[in-house]
């Protein structure tokens, strides 16, 4: 892996891989977290949609046609910490792919034409979001347990905030955060580093620097409590716990990840063993460390039946109390080393998958 930074501040991460395909991902620190700086919730996601509506030299139809001609797969995604644009092409079409996406990101038209139609699409996405029951459970949890953090509200905003958006709001967000020093492009290709750098400079080197940003993220402790919501279209019960992890050192974050492997991050973990293996009370039971900027949480997720809710939550609470008292978690060095090996393996598998 090689890394460099262009004169305009854009960072390039390169990995050579002998294959007939090339992949790239353009990541920008312009996710939903940046809406904390005086923007309507849903602005980041709506802007991602609108970038595909046309550029100063290409129409939406042009973009769609070229996408079909160039890419085996391409997409975009807005999360709390970032927005990404990515695609995979044949090696011979890599330059064409970069050309198209540089135009999409650097030269969006952001016109009023087509804006209302795209907002209708996002309104449909909002309805589908509400039908995703695990996501709905998490939304309810974050909304109730945080007072001010951006994760209190959905990434895509609400019906009210989406309805209040306009092109000027999107343009203001774009001009502030879509700047090269706020961005990174990663490339996996059979081309040499020098060839790749030349192409990235050709298509992104002219991306003008914006105003230097001093970015920060709001964190706060969660409010303790139990929050219950009845969904009429729901057969079973979704359960989620969250614990804040912000403010940890890198060594402490590593320790939490090792702990989580034993707690709920594997099929031999305490939660999985007690709730699923021994008692068969839940189909899904796991815990996860979420290290992303703006999240910094440990979450527990369970999927069970209505009649087993109290038993499942009782076991979770009992395990947590045992850990706090020092009675339930005393791993030896062999167990810690095994957890470390498994986490390394998972990371390698994740990285391998992300390059495909």
Tell where the protein language model's regions lie, with residue ranges.
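Charge-rich, well-structured scaffold segments of protease-associated domains
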Residues: 60-212, 219, 245-247, 255, ...
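His/Glu-rich zincin catalytic helix
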Residues: 1-62, 171-274, 313
């Amino acid at each position: 892996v090689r890394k460099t930074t262009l004169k305009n501040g854009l960072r390039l991460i390169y990995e050579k891989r002998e294959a007939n395909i090339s992949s790239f991902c353009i990541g920008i620190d312009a996710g939903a977290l940046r809406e904390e700086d005086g923007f309507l919730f849903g602005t980041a996601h709506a802007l991602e949609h609108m970038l595909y509506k046309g550029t100063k030299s290409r129409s939406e139809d042009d973009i769609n046609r070229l996408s079909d001609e160039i890419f085996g797969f391409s997409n975009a995604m807005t999360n709390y910490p970032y927005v990404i644009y990515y695609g995979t092409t044949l090696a011979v079409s890599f330059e064409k792919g970069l050309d198209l996406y540089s135009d999409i990101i650097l030269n969006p038209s952001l016109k009023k034409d087509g804006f209302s139609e795209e907002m209708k699409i996002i309104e449909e996405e909002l309805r589908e979001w509400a039908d995703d029951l695990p996501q709905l459970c998490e939304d309810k949890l974050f909304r109730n347990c945080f007072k001010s953090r951006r994760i209190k509200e959905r990434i895509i905003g609400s019906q009210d905030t989406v309805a209040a958006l306009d092109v000027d709001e999107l343009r203001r967000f774009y001009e502030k955060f879509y700047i090269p020093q706020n961005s990174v492009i990663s490339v996996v290709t059979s081309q040499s580093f020098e060839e790749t750098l030349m192409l990235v400079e050709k298509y992104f080197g002219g991306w003008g620097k914006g105003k230097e940003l001093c970015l920060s993220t709001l964190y706060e402790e969660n409010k303790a409590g139990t929050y219950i919501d009845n969904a009429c279209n729901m057969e079973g019960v979704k359960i989620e716990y969250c614990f804040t992890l912000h403010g940890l050192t890198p060594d402490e974050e590593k320790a939490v990840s090792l702990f989580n492997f034993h707690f709920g991050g594997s099929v031999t973990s305490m939660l999985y063993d007690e709730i699923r293996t021994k008692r068969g009370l839940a189909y899904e039971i796991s815990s996860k460390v979420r290290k992303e900027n703006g999240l910094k949480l440990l979450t527990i997720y369970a999927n069970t039946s209505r009649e087993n809710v109290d038993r499942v939550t009782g076991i979770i609470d009992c395990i947590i109390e045992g850990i706090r008292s020092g009675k339930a978690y005393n791993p030896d060095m062999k167990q810690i080393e095994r957890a470390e090996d498994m986490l390394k393996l998972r990371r390698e598998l994740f990285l391998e998958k992300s390059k495909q």
